C-alpha cells in the first residue's frame, strides 16, 4: 500500500514530457524536390497536451517555420536555435545525424519553456500531420477543425500505437536510454524523489494515447536523467522503430535500394 501510494503521489507531483527525433528518411530521392524528414515521437502525462502519445514526420523547412512562429509570438522570451544549414555534403550520413541531434535539442529546449509550450502551433506541429498552411488556417479559425479536434482526430486514427509501444518495451536493450525526459514539478508543492527505474518503466508501459481536453498547465520544466523508452512505431511504415543514430533511409521500393549518392541529395538537406 505504501509503495502504491508513493507512486501515485510522485505521479501527481510530476509531469513528464519525452520527445525523440529519429528515423531520418530521404523522400522523393532522385528528383529535384527530394528532401529528408524526421520522425518525432512524443510521450507525456502532462495536461498541457491533448494527446498523451503522438508520432509525426517533419522536415527541416517545417522546423524553420515553427521557430519563426514561436519567435513572433513569444515576445522577449528567447527561442532556442536550430542546427544551421550546410553547403557541403561530403559525408551525408554524418550530416543528417548531426542535424537530427540538433533538431532534438531544439525541441527539448522548446518544451522546457512555459511560454513556448502554450503556443497552439507547436502542439499542431508535434501532434498532427497538418501541413504548414493547414496549421496556420487552423489556429486562425479558418480550418475545418479546432486545434483540439485536429489533434484528437489524428490521435484516434493512430490509436494502435499503444499496443505496439508496450510490445516494443519488452524487447528494449538494457542500455537504451531516453534522449529527452523533462519532469515538470507542479507549482506550490514539494517535489518528491523520482521513482526507481523499474517503477518508472512500468508507468511508461501503462500510458496509452488517451486524450486530455484540459488546458495547458503552467509548470516550469526541469531536465532530469534519462530512462528506458519504447521506440516509436509508424502505422504507415510497420517496420520496427529504428535507433536514433541509424543513417537515413531511402523512401523507395526494395528493388531500387542502393547507396545514396551525395549529388542526389544536394536539394534535400535544407528543405
UniProtKB/Swiss-Prot annotation:
Keywords: Cell membrane, Cytoplasm, Endosome, Lipid-binding, Membrane, Protein transport, Transport. Residues 185-271 are annotated as: Disordered. Residues 213-230 have a biased composition (Low complexity). Residues 16-132 form the PX domain. Residues 135-139 are annotated as: Important for membrane trafficking. It is a peripheral membrane protein. GO terms for cellular component: cytoplasm; endosome; plasma membrane. A 1,2-diacyl-sn-glycero-3-phospho-(1D-myo-inositol-3-phosphate) binds at residues 59, 85, 99. It is found in: Cell membrane; Endosome; Cytoplasm. GO terms for biological process: intracellular protein transport; vesicle organization. Pfam families: PX. Disulfide bonds: none annotated. The keyword Transport applies. GO terms for molecular function: phosphatidylinositol phosphate binding. Its main location: membrane. The PX domain mediates interaction with membranes enriched in phosphatidylinositol 3-phosphate. Monomer. Interacts with TRPV3; this interaction promotes TRPV3 trafficking from the cell membrane to lysosome for degradation. Phosphoinositide-binding protein involved in protein sorting and membrane trafficking in endosomes. Regulates the levels of TRPV3 by promoting its trafficking from the cell membrane to lysosome for degradation. Belongs to the sorting nexin family. This is Sorting nexin-11. It comes from Mus musculus (Mouse). The gene is Snx11.
Amino acid at each position: 500500500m505504501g509503495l502504491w501510494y508513493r507512486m501515485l503521489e510522485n505521479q501527481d507531483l510530476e509531469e513528464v514530457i519525452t520527445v525523440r527525433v529519429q528515423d531520418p528518411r530521404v523522400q522523393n530521392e532522385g528528383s529535384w524536390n527530394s528532401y529528408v524528414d524526421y520522425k518525432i515521437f512524443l510521450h507525456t502525462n502532462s495536461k498541457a497536451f491533448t494527446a498523451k502519445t503522438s508520432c509525426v514526420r517533419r522536415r527541416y523547412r517545417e522546423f524553420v517555420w515553427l521557430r519563426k512562429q514561436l519567435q513572433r509570438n513569444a515576445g522577449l522570451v528567447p527561442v532556442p536555435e536550430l542546427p544551421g544549414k550546410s553547403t557541403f555534403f561530403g559525408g551525408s550520413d554524418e550530416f543528417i545525424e548531426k542535424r537530427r541531434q540538433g533538431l532534438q535539442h531544439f525541441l527539448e529546449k522548446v518544451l522546457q519553456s512555459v511560454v513556448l509550450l502554450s503556443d497552439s502551433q507547436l502542439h499542431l506541429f508535434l501532434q498532427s500531420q497538418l501541413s504548414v498552411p493547414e496549421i496556420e488556417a487552423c489556429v486562425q479559425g479558418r480550418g475545418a477543425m479546432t486545434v483540439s479536434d485536429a489533434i484528437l482526430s489524428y490521435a484516434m486514427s493512430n490509436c494502435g500505437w499503444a499496443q505496439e509501444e508496450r510490445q516494443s518495451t519488452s524487447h528494449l536493450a538494457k542500455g537504451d536510454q531516453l534522449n529527452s525526459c523533462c519532469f515538470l514539478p507542479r507549482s506550490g508543492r514539494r517535489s518528491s524523489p523520482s521513482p526507481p527505474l523499474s517503477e518508472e518503466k512500468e508507468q511508461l508501459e501503462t500510458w496509452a494515447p488517451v486524450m486530455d481536453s484540459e488546458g495547458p498547465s503552467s509548470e516550469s520544466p526541469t531536465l532530469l536523467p534519462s530512462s528506458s523508452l519504447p521506440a516509436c512505431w509508424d502505422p504507415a511504415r510497420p517496420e520496427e522503430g529504428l535507433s536514433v543514430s541509424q543513417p537515413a533511409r531511402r523512401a523507395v521500393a526494395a528493388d531500387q535500394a542502393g547507396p545514396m549518392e551525395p549529388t542526389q541529395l544536394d536539394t534535400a538537406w535544407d528543405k
